[in-house]
């Protein structure tokens, strides 16, 4: 029997909740979107008092399944059971009232409302005159925070909080509904190491209270640290569920990608040509100074350094986003002035920014519109008019080459997985036929399979003579992909290491100097 959300909520409120080993299950679930099967005969089982991680490449179906379980989507086939009874969730509010809360990667709070107002919105306590009882709301919030060991002022406006503290408010809001199922989508993507540790303390405490937590992540170390068990999805299919302490990292990778990955960093020895880009004493007052390096055709120059070292600032200056205070930039031995992105593009330079959502993709536009932005002013203009046919053909070919998973180029970029969004951005710049490619954190926030694809693409570009500058915070990536590694600390270059001599210890010594 399948219960309506209202009936299920009433049963839950009465305390007569059906007993089951599992809090939440999905059986035979299928979900299609135009041209794409997002989920195909998927199953999932969440036990009480456990953290269950979901793993899989971008586009594997993890988020789609969670949106079904949270009432955002409705399955085309299959059944969802809550505490052993079938249920049809028609909306996120239905899910909340039945004890299922989802904390999205993009946090959903009202910035100009207080912490307390955000938590109790539409459920504010009222005084005997029917007005909001702010004093009682503060007390309720303080009691909730005490339970969760959260140290925040209930009266502060959310816009003044860090991302980590906003996440704490979201968790508190979910728990305030007496939720016993909590779904967390990439909760640590914008957190520092200390903030992650605090979040894990709260998750462990919630687990000890019998709450079941679904934890979507790309980070393998988090799975082993916080998850009791995990399920893997691939291409919209359920692959399997295992205890976290019974598998290795390589086991999980094999399950995720469906093949052995013996070489995550397919660096090849390619002929290194002449110097393409030469930077001398480049300075941006107050940010970095006297930065000097060369990059040759076919070379991958890795750039390493801790947060605040100035790596991204150097990239932005090279591309003309923030013009230098002093120093010189030369291309093919000829000094050039690059004080705008347009000038950089004219010199056949391309720049994949660190944050694909804020400074890269135009999320509300489709793939075609995103890909063509950098080339409309020149490459496909004839007699003052844009050749739409040629633009579309070039973008379709690039999409196939990069293996962007999409039914067509009219798909909005916001609907793509992180890895496919990154491919769209790379495709945008490859259409300009660059000679110098600057990549700032090219694989951040994407899954292991998509990372391997991007690494192969970068290697292919180097083989074709492109000079590549690759900024990365992932040490294995820097060591595995670079011909040389430039290390920065507090706005200065502290050393440049050849591939043969570079080790993690040497890089960290230079980065912390």
Swiss-Prot record:
Gene Ontology terms, MF aspect: ABC-type D-ribose transporter activity; ATP binding; ATP hydrolysis activity
Q: Which residues cross the membrane?
A: none
Q: What class of enzyme is it?
A: translocase
User: Which keywords label this protein?
Assistant: ATP-binding, Cell inner membrane, Cell membrane, Membrane, Nucleotide-binding, Plasmid, Repeat, Sugar transport, Translocase, Transport
Residues reported to bind ATP? 56-63
Documented EC number(s): 7.5.2.11, 7.5.2.7
Report the family membership: Belongs to the ABC transporter superfamily. Carbohydrate importer 2 (CUT2) (TC 3.A.1.2) family.
Q: Which domain of life is it from?
A: Bacteria
Residue ranges of domain ABC transporter in the record: 24-260, 270-510
What does UniProt give as GO cellular component? Answer: plasma membrane
Protein name according to UniProt: Putative ribose/galactose/methyl galactoside import ATP-binding protein 2
Name which cysteines form disulfide bonds.
none
Q: What does this protein do?
A: Part of an ABC transporter complex involved in carbohydrate import. Could be involved in ribose, galactose and/or methyl galactoside import. Responsible for energy coupling to the transport system.
Location in or out of the cell:
Cell inner membrane
Tell me which PROSITE patterns the record gives: ABC_TRANSPORTER_1, ABC_TRANSPORTER_2, MGLA, RBSA
**What taxonomic ancestry is recorded?**
Bacteria, Pseudomonadati, Pseudomonadota, Alphaproteobacteria, Hyphomicrobiales
Q: Which Pfam families match?
A: ABC_tran (PF00005)
Reaction catalysed by this enzyme: D-ribose(out) + ATP + H2O = D-ribose(in) + ADP + phosphate + H(+); D-galactose(out) + ATP + H2O = D-galactose(in) + ADP + phosphate + H(+)
Q: What topology does the record note for this protein and the membrane? A: Peripheral membrane protein
């Amino acid at each position: 029997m399948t219960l309506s959300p209202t009936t299920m909520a009433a049963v839950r409120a009465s305390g007569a909740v059906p007993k089951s080993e599992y809090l939440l299950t999905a059986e035979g679930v299928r979900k299609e979107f135009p041209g794409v099967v997002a989920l195909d005969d998927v199953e999932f089982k969440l036990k009480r008092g456990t953290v269950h991680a979901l793993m899989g490449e971008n586009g594997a179906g993890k988020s789609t399944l969670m949106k079904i379980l949270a009432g955002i989507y409705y399955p085309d086939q299959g059944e969802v059971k809550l505490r052993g009874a079938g249920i049809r969730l028609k909306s996120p509010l239905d899910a909340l009232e039945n004890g299922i809360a989802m904390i999205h990667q993009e946090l959903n709070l009202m910035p100009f409302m207080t912490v307390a107002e955000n938590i109790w919105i539409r459920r504010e306590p009222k005084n005997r005159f029917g007005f909001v009882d702010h004093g009682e709301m503060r007390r309720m919030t303080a009691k909730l925070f005490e339970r969760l060991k959260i140290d925040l002022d209930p009266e502060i406006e959310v816009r003044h909080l860090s991302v980590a503290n906003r996440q704490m408010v979201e968790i508190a809001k979910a728990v305030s509904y007496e939720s016993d199922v909590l779904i967390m989508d990439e909760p640590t993507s914008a957190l520092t190491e200390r903030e992650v540790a605090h979040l894990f303390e709260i998750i462990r405490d919630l687990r000890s209270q019998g709450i079941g937590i679904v934890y979507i992540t790309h980070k393998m170390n988090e799975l082993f640290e916080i998850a009791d068990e995990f399920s893997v999805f691939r291409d919209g299919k359920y692959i399997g569920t295992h205890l976290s302490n019974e598998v290795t990292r390589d086991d999980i990778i094999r399950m995720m990608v469906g093949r052995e990955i013996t070489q995550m960093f397919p660096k090849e020895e390619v002929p290194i040509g002449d110097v393409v880009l030469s930077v001398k004493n480049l300075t941006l007052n107050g940010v970095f100074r006297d930065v000097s390096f060369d990059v040759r055709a076919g070379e991958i120059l890795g750039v390493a350094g801790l947060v605040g070292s100035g790596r991204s600032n150097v990239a932005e200056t090279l591309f003309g986003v923030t013009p230098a205070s002093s120093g010189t930039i030369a291309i093919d031995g000829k000094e050039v002035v690059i004080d705008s992105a347009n000038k950089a593009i004219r010199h056949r330079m391309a720049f994949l920014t660190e944050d694909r959502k804020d400074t890269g993709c135009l999320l509300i536009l489709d793939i075609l519109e995103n890909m063509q932005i950098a080339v409309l002013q020149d490459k496909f203009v004839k007699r003052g008019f844009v050749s739409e046919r040629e633009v579309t053909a070039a973008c379709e070919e690039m999409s196939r080459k990069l293996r962007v998973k999409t039914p067509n180029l009219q798909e909005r970029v916001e609907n793509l997985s992180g890895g496919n969004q990154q491919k769209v951005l790379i495709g945008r710049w490859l259409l300009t036929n660059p000679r110098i490619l600057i990549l700032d954190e090219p694989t951040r926030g994407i899954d292991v399979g998509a990372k391997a694809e991007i690494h192969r693409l970068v290697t292919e570009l180097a083989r074709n003579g492109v000079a590549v500058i690759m900024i990365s915070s992932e040490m294995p990536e820097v060591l595995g992909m670079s011909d040389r590694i430039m290390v920065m600390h507090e706005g200065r270059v502290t050393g440049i290491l050849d591939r043969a001599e570079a080790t993690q210890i040497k890089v960290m010594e230079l980065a912390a100097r």
